[in-house]
């Protein structure tokens, strides 16, 4: 059985699915907004962005968070620093030019929440708003790291 879908949007390719469930393209995929990200070898730290033939170099801090981006002429096109919870401050350039925030987090441009595969993190409150996938096994379903050094020290001293 072959299924086909046609989109009413202009210049969209026709998608068809064969009897084995494989998607087949009939036409060229539009590449108007194609973005290629290059990562540091063996990590998730972005080091470059390629868009519309233009190459950008990304500089990250010691935590792997992007802090600057330069075009091929060496001009700064994006720059930001972060507060203690990872929220952007003092941003220069288009905010979502680089959507990566804390390592492994991708900022949703509509909600300004950071997505971590299974959860959403709100940098304005410094906590996750989605439950931990391991639920109560982590002892706090929305915790982002150790919040209290004193509680950690007391826990260590007791045991």
Residue ranges of each PLM-predicted region?
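Acidic/glycine-rich beta-solenoid
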Residues: 1-55, 73-77, 90-98
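Conserved active-site tyrosine of GNAT-family acetyltransferases
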Residues: 39, 60, 80-82, 121-122, ...
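Short acidic/glycine-enriched loop/turn segments that link adjacent beta-strands
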Residues: 110, 139-140
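A motif-centric feature for acidic-aromatic and gly/ser/thr-rich catalytic loops and repeats
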Residues: 48, 52-117, 151-152
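Short strand->helix junction
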Residues: 75, 135-136
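Short, low-complexity export/processing leader segments characterized by acidic and small residues
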Residues: 68-69, 87-89, 119-129, 133, ...
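Activation loop
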Residues: 35, 98, 117, 140-143
């Amino acid at each position: 059985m072959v299924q086909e879908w046609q989109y009413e949007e202009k210049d969209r390719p026709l998608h068809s699915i064969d009897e084995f469930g494989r998607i087949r393209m009939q036409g060229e995929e539009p590449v108007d907004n194609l973005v290629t990200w290059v990562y540091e070898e063996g990590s998730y730290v972005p080091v470059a962005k390629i868009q519309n033939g233009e190459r950008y170099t990304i500089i990250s801090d010691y935590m792997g968070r992007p802090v600057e981006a330069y075009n091929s002429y060496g001009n700064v096109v994006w720059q930001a620093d972060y507060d203690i919870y990872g929220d952007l401050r003092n941003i220069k350039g288009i905010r979502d030019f680089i959507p990566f925030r804390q390592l492994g987090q991708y900022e949703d441009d509509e909600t300004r929440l950071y997505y971590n595969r299974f959860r959403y993190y709100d940098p304005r409150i410094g906590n996750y708003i989605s439950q931990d996938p391991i639920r109560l096994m982590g002892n706090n379903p929305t915790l982002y790291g150790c919040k209290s050094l004193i509680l950690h020290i007391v826990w260590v001293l007791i045991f």
